[in-house]
């Protein structure tokens, strides 16, 4: 279907570049300590014996990980923290959604057909979600929503699944580009004329999390 292969039209303010090296710097927050003191996340976790790659490979294969003890607790705490901030301070409504969806849902959020090779397909023509955006967005698919009830703001924490077939040659060290991971996702259903304002608002919501954790970051375009 040719229509399914036509991408969304970028906003006219989006810069044109050959790849991420030509992204534009917008702003940053915080200070990064000297690189000579920085260790990778997997090195720190292995030294503390709170992560297990070998056992994960034994039971599931490559690109899986087992979190142990304080690291498993940290993951749970961060998920709860982010959900609380987004629901109590940022105005999002929390949902618990399915991680298995039908093919229409995958097409409806642009995962298919372009990213087919990066998805996990089940035998019954259902799919494991690569992000809870698929489930959250499709809650309103084929629906007519009263203009006055917008915006709708959804947040969910789910397991996400990605085959990462296109990740060959990219950074896959440690917990990067895993087949299974947990993610807190924000979705806004918004009036078209307010889309850019809502995008800025969502970026601000994400920034708030990093600021509360005192983590340095950059905003790029």
What are these model-derived regions, one by one?
Residues 28-221:
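TRNA-recognition modules of translation machinery and tRNA-sensing kinases, especially anticodon-binding
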Residues 1-32, 50:
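N-terminal alpha-helical targeting/anchoring segments
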